[in-house]
């Protein structure tokens, strides 16, 4: 897996779409109900669009009503790093890829059991590696 730091800014701008760059590198937020995965029900693994790290399983995805893909748990304890975000006059928990530092979205304490957490992610920060049907 490649880390963000191994890419120059010019390389990141070339390999990411403008929206992916704005979200992952500038802590942007896509508009609600517009991202590719907000209403996606396909099975698979959601990976970081920058470094391809596995972040979330579709098994932990749920409909939060927020308009963004929401998950109650990451695939492992060390794949998503949580940081304090004080932008826009709020105190929130920013979720970033622990491997490459890409901004993914935010974590809120209003999710379902068993964790009570809602990882509210930007579709632009992820790609879905769909499960393949077994023959």
Protein language model features and the residues they cover:
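A short Gly-Trp-Pro
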Residues: 3-135
């Amino acid at each position: 897996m490649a880390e963000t730091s191994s890419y120059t800014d010019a390389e990141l701008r070339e390999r990411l779409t403008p929206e992916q760059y704005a979200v992952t590198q500038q802590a942007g937020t896509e508009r609600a109900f517009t991202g590719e995965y907000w209403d996606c029900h396909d099975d698979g693994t959601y990976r970081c669009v920058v470094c391809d790290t596995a972040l979330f399983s579709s098994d932990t995805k749920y409909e939060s009503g927020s308009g963004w893909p929401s998950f109650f748990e990451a695939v492992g304890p060390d794949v998503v790093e949580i940081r304090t975000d004080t932008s826009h006059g709020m105190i929130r928990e920013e979720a970033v890829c622990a491997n490459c530092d890409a901004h993914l979205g935010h974590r809120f304490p209003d999710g379902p059991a068993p964790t009570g957490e809602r990882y509210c992610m930007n579709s632009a920060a992820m790609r879905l590696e769909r499960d393949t049907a077994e023959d």
